[in-house]
A protein has these predicted regions:
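Short, acidic, Ser/Thr-enriched surface-loop or helix-capping motifs
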Residues: 129, 240-241
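C-terminal accessory region of radical SAM enzymes
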Residues: 155-224, 245-297
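Radical SAM/AdoMet-radical enzyme domain recognition
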Residues: 1-18, 23-155
């Protein structure tokens, strides 16, 4: 933890994940130590009986500022079926409410698959009703249990990312391993400025139209969209395993070093793997030719999982470089990407 603090200011967000962090008897001591070091502390608990008001109160008292909870369906039937554990939906909803009451910020993480994609509008309703600092849609990386799940096609993913852009006027929205969301945001901003219909211009399909129609039922909201952060594996993000090995992300099993042998700052700043992942000239395939490479870069974790090459093209992106029809307007807008409406 002291090595993370050595990154300096602004202090990195320190997230304790698992498994279930509440399985550690010293979880509160770890949070307290991180807080003493000046780190913003967050915890990602599982929807188990250990997710109680007592444990959340202890987290808050120890210095945690936020938690993240997984919610993949808007009903017990869907969520518990997806997680294969009865009772997780009710425990998660209760924990969400209690965390908010205690003053903890809550991020909701939703895995998007063929079996859960139609839950997205109803999940958004829950996010609006119960309140969350962020709703994060996770696009599958085929590792671990992710290899057993039905991932969306690239065109379906495009429909979902455009729905999430629309949802951004209702709640703070981000993606996990969906880096081409930044491309979609830029495309939509340019089209909106030109008054061009995005459905036709982007060739969006029936999945988008179904999700958008259900979104319209929620009612008009006009909040400022949260600009998507440019964070990717090894670029603004680092994962340290429970045994000390250092990885660009939790979904990329390549180790760049070990905190028991080198400092975390040295590994992040100097290892060939991390340096390579921050160099867009190393990107291959369509990603290497894409005009959006500087703001997107594709999921390096998914590229590695599918091809064995961390610099390979993004498998879930259907975009052909140079195909956006308003390239001049796009070139003018790209420098202002951080100011998305």
């Amino acid at each position: 933890m002291s090595q993370v603090a050595d990154f300096g200011k602004p202090a990195p967000i320190f997230i304790i994940t698992g498994g279930d962090p509440f399985e550690r008897a010293d979880i509160y001591e770890l949070v307290r130590r991180g807080k003493e070091l000046g780190l913003p502390m967050a915890v990602s608990p599982s929807g188990t009986p250990k997710l109680s008001r007592e444990s959340l109160t202890k987290l808050k008292d120890a210095g945690a500022s936020a938690i993240s909870l997984s919610l993949d369906g808007a009903s017990a039937e869907v969520h518990d079926g997806f997680r294969r554990v009865p009772g997780t939906f009710d425990r998660t909803i209760t924990g969400w409410r209690e965390a908010r009451e205690l003053g903890l910020r809550v991020q909701i993480n939703s895995t998007v698959t063929k079996s859960t994609v139609h839950e997205l509008p109803d999940l958004l309703r829950l996010v609006i009703e119960l309140g969350a600092m962020t709703w994060s849609a996770f696009l599958l990386v085929p590792t671990g249990r992710g290899t057993e799940l039905d991932a969306l096609t690239p065109r379906e993913t495009e429909d979902v990312l455009n729905f999430l852009y629309d949802a951004g006027t209702f709640a703070p929205v981000k993606t996990t391993e969906g880096h081409h969301f930044r491309r979609v945001v830029m495309e939509r901003e340019v089209l909106a400025d030109l008054g061009v219909d995005h459905v036709e211009a982007l060739g969006l399909g029936s999945l988008y139209q179904d999700l958008a129609a259900r979104l319209a039922e929620i009612g008009p909201v006009d909040r400022k969209r949260r600009p998507p952060l440019h964070v990717n594996a090894g670029n603004g993000f680092v994962f340290v395993s429970h045994v000390g090995t250092v990885h660009p992300s939790g979904f990329m099993p390549i180790a760049a070093g070990d905190v028991r042998e080198q400092t975390l700052t040295d590994i992040y700043r100097e290892s060939p793997l991390f340096l390579g992942l921050r160099d867009t000239s190393r990107l291959e395939g369509r990603c290497g030719k894409c005009e959006f490479a500087g703001i997107c870069g594709g999921s390096r974790s998914r590229a590695y999982a599918v091809s064995g090459d961390p610099y390979g093209e993004e498998p879930l992106c259907p975009y052909e470089p140079g195909s956006f029809p308003y390239q001049h307007e796009l070139a003018l807008a790209l420098p202002n990407m951080g100011n998305a409406r």
